[in-house]
Design a protein with these regions (language model features):
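Juxtamembrane intracellular "pre-TM" segments in multi-pass secondary transporters
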Residues: 1-4, 182-213
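Helix-to-loop junctions at the C-terminal end of transmembrane segments
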Residues: 57-69, 153, 256-269, 354
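Structural signature of the two symmetry-related core transmembrane helices
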Residues: 72-87, 272-287
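Cytoplasmic helix-loop-helix junction between adjacent transmembrane helices
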Residues: 102-138
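Symmetry-related core transmembrane helices of the 12-TM Major Facilitator Superfamily/SLC fold
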Residues: 162-180, 363-379
Length: 391
């Protein structure tokens, strides 16, 4: 049996999972507030639970990937997604909608970790290239999904049932791809190594540092997809123009991944991507207190995207180098769960800072937090990378 799947099928899977995921984020707040007549606070709590269950799905999926058939686990996740979304096709009132959304959160976290773990198993391609292209596929799925979800929602007369029907059909078709192309061998451990391989201390410290860095980065980054919409529209920018910022983000990521793949063939220091990315992410927030017009917000988004495209896919690639083949899934699950936790906590954290102080202090806090993450990562890498064992 083959030890890795064809790369194109892995990218297709990642793309489709993120198309499905992108149907949830843009509409949940509007649907819960306007159609289910709940408060914005309740909408925020529902999204918090959705991201929180992502953490559970990511962690559990990663642990199981190393022990059981990855194909069956992925197929099980797709079947569960079809069932939960199928319920929402016919019954999407309160409280069915938030309950099903929390269950879908588990499945989406599970499927994201499955794809990252499949990528971590690949030996025919460079790890940096694999994770850069996975990130590219993720974002392409998000851009495609968010582009079509608005018109579909309007066409369905503000009913989410048809949207979930589209997702059910898409996932059902994807299950056929998984059945045919996602079969890889389960790595059998020697009987005396049934327990998890003990990593060198330097490896463990670097993995936890990278995971913590991803949590903080996503906490700060998620301000853009949550609290920043209110801030930007409050400066006289329309919702259409705000949405255009995300189109710019998606197109830039597509272009940047091609440039990064070219750089990867000429540069052999992955850590530099993390340092550069953290610096750009921090700088993007430092621009915001001085932003007076739409052009400044576009500039900040461009700088943010430079940081995002270099730092965020680098972290799972670095972790992949630091863990053995038989534990790839577990550690990718940990990294994904930290990222999901950051996405869950970010909007709440930002809201509390804004409520207590204002937007300006939030921007400075985000700048300092991300630059601090870059500094701590640099110190830990300098301390441990020579003693670390690379797999």
């Amino acid at each position: 049996m083959q030890t890795e799947i064809k790369f194109r099928w892995l990218l297709l899977g990642s793309f489709l999972v993120n198309v499905g995921n992108s149907f949830i984020w843009p509409l949940t707040t509007v649907y819960i507030h306007d159609q289910l007549h709940q408060s914005l606070t309740v909408s925020g709590i529902v999204l918090l639970f959705y991201s929180g269950t992502n953490v559970i799905g990511s962690y559990v999926g990663g642990r199981l990937f190393d022990k059981y058939s990855p194909q069956r686990l992925t197929l099980g996740g797709i079947v569960a997604a079809v069932i939960f979304m199928g319920v929402l096709v016919f019954k999407n009132d309160w409280p069915t909608y938030p309950i099903m959304l929390a269950l879908i959160g588990i499945v989406n976290g599970w499927l994201m970790t499955m794809h990252n773990s499949y990528g971590a198993r690949m030996r025919s391609r460079d790890g940096r290239f694999v994770f850069n292209m996975l990130y590219f596929a993720n974002n392409l799925g998000m851009v495609f999904g968010t582009t079509i979800v608005g018109p579909l929602y309007q066409y369905a007369h503000d009913n989410v049932g048809p949207l979930f029907l589209v997702t059910v059909v898409m996932y059902a078709a994807f299950s056929l791809v998984v059945i045919k192309f996602y079969q890889i061998a389960v790595i059998k451990r020697p009987q005396h190594e049934e327990k998890m391989v003990k990593l060198p201390r330097a490896n463990s410290q670097l993995i936890w540092t990278m995971s913590g860095a991803l949590l903080v980065i996503w906490m700060m980054y998620s301000q853009w997809s949550s609290n920043m919409s209110v801030y930007i529209t409050g400066h006289g920018v329309s919702m259409t123009s705000y949405s255009l910022l995300w189109t710019i983000n998606g197109l830039l990521i597509v272009a940047l991944q091609m440039a990064i793949n070219w750089l990867n063939r000429r540069m052999n220091n992955d850590h530099l991507y993390l340092y550069f990315g953290a610096a750009m992410l921090g700088l993007s927030f430092l621009i915001l207190p001085f932003a007076k017009g739409y052009g400044a917000f576009v500039f900040s988004m461009v700088v943010l995207t430079l940081g995002e495209a270099t730092a965020i896919p680098t972290i799972p690639a670095l972790v992949n180098q630091l863990c053995p083949m038989e534990d790839k899934g577990r550690y990718q699950g940990i990294v994904n769960s930290f990222g999901s936790a950051g996405k869950a906590l970010g909007p709440l954290f930002g809201g509390l800072v804004i409520e207590r102080f204002s937007y300006q202090p939030l921007f400075y806090v985000c700048t300092l937090a991300i630059l601090g993450v870059g500094l701590v990562s640099w110190l830990m890498i300098e301390k441990n990378h020579r003693q670390a064992e690379y797999y």
